[in-house]
């Protein structure tokens, strides 16, 4: 059943991409028109006092359609999450699970457990009270009514840093700790409350300790990576992004995995797709860091890689915001032909607005694109420019320019699905 589900998801995404090609003359004419439109946009007054880099690749034709300042190093902002997501799906796979374990170290004597209860953190950013209650229910099923011992929290999944490298001191984002409950880092008090509500008394105190050898895993909650990618990408959730970033780090199997370990895997992927990781700087998984530097070209290559890699594409594509429909693109509607067509990640920090993703041209060609606007007084100006680019990419030819053979009688078109 699971394999069938994955197959159907993949076929669905392929169906979205596979559009019947129109005659080559019409496609070539549209490509030239798109280039002309983008050339005109380079005269936009916004670019007189700010910087812009763009990379547009025709995946269907396997050709570079347009590039401007594509090699300039710029801050990707939350488009950094594209790098994190693609690397995670490539390295860990779409079946990867975030794991939170409940362990016992001791013995039961009647309704009392003599020993410690341990929660092993797996940096699940979405862990909820109801899910932890499911773990606690296992204790009740064993007849445990009281615990004569301590609550141990094993937080060794990641290093002890609570902020990413290059984060601003006044950022109001959540601290990155490996154990959250209902989006809050105050796990201990909430866990004790849930125990009490379940009729279990915990007599000891809370301590941070490594999981003792020989401790028994009595329950484990697992969350598919796709469930974390969706809020990470669609809503640009920074905590989810850092959680995925540290799953990469933990892949090294080293205790207290650090951001440096995650960066090594990202750099390895960049090198493997034909670019040189030394030309860029990766500092975190969310894009909050001011130390991140990348190019529009890098994002174009990563998007091409994701599109052409079956284990990556379905979960990645499904996680992207859809223009005019959901996520951080739900309120964008100034590019009519982009609505429900463009699937892309947004990025925004002070002075920066970015956009990277996929769209389909009027003649059915799949494009990947990256647009980086920097040096902005108002991010809205960058978004408006990007909307004009999207309309240029997705709208068709003016009626007077459509080659005769490109006019299709839709009444005679048969669709099978």
Predicted regions and their residues:
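Beta-lactamase-like hydrolase cores
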Residues: 24-60, 64-73, 135-141
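Active-site SXXK
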Residues: 62, 76-95, 151, 190-191, ...
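Bacterial N-terminal signal peptides that target proteins for export
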Residues: 2-11
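Acidic/histidine-enriched alpha-helical segments
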Residues: 53, 99-105, 148-161, 202-214, ...
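C-terminal soluble interaction/assembly domains
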Residues: 281-417
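Bacterial N-terminal signal peptides
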Residues: 10-20
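Active-site-adjacent helix/loop patches that line small-molecule binding or acyl-intermediate pockets
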Residues: 100-106, 112-195, 223-265, 294
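A small/polar active-site loop signature that marks catalytic segments
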Residues: 181-319
């Amino acid at each position: 059943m699971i394999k069938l589900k994955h197959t159907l998801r993949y076929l669905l995404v392929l169906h979205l991409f596979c559009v019947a090609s129109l005659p080559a003359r019409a496609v070539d004419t549209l490509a030239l028109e798109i280039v002309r439109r983008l050339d005109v946009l380079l005269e936009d007054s916004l670019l007189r006092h700010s910087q812009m880099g763009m990379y547009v690749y025709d995946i269907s034709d396997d050709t570079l359609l347009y590039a401007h300042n594509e090699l300039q190093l710029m801050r990707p902002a939350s488009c950094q999450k594209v790098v994190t997501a693609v690397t995670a799906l490539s390295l860990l796979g779409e079946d990867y699970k975030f794991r939170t374990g409940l362990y016992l170290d001791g013995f039961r004597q009647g309704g009392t457990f003599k020993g410690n209860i341990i929660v092993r953190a797996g940096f699940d950013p979405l862990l909820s009270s109801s899910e932890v209650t499911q773990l606690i229910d296992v204790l009740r099923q064993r007849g445990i009514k009281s615990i004569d011992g301590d609550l141990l929290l094993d937080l060794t999944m990641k290093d002890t840093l609570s902020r990413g490298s290059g984060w601003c001191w006044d950022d109001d984002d959540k601290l990155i700790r490996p154990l959250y409950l209902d989006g809050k880092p105050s796990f201990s008090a909430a866990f004790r409350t849930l125990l009490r509500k379940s009729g279990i008394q915990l007599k000891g105190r809370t301590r941070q300790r490594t999981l003792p050898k020989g401790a028994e895993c009595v329950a484990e909650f697992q969350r598919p990576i796709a469930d974390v990618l969706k809020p990470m990408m669609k809503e640009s959730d920074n905590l989810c992004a850092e959680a995925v970033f540290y799953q990469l780090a933990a892949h090294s199997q080293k205790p207290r995995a650090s951001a440096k370990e995650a960066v090594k895997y990202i750099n390895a992927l960049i090198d493997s797709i034909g670019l040189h990781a030394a030309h860029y700087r990766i500092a975190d998984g969310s894009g909050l860091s001011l130390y991140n530097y990348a190019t529009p070209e890098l994002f174009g290559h990563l998007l091409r890689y994701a599109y052409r890699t079956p284990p990556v594409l379905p979960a990645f594509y499904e996680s992207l915001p859809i223009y005019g429909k959901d996520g951080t693109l739900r309120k964008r509607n100034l590019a009519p032909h982009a609505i429900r067509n463009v699937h892309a990640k947004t990025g925004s920090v002070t002075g920066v607005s970015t956009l990277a993703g996929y769209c389909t041209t009027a003649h059915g060609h799949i494009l990947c694109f990256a647009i980086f606007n920097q040096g902005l007084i108002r991010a809205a100006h960058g978004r408006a420019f990007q909307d004009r680019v999207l309309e240029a990419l997705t709208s068709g030819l003016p009626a007077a320019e459509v080659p005769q053979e490109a006019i299709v009688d839709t009444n005679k078109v048969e669709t099978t699905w």
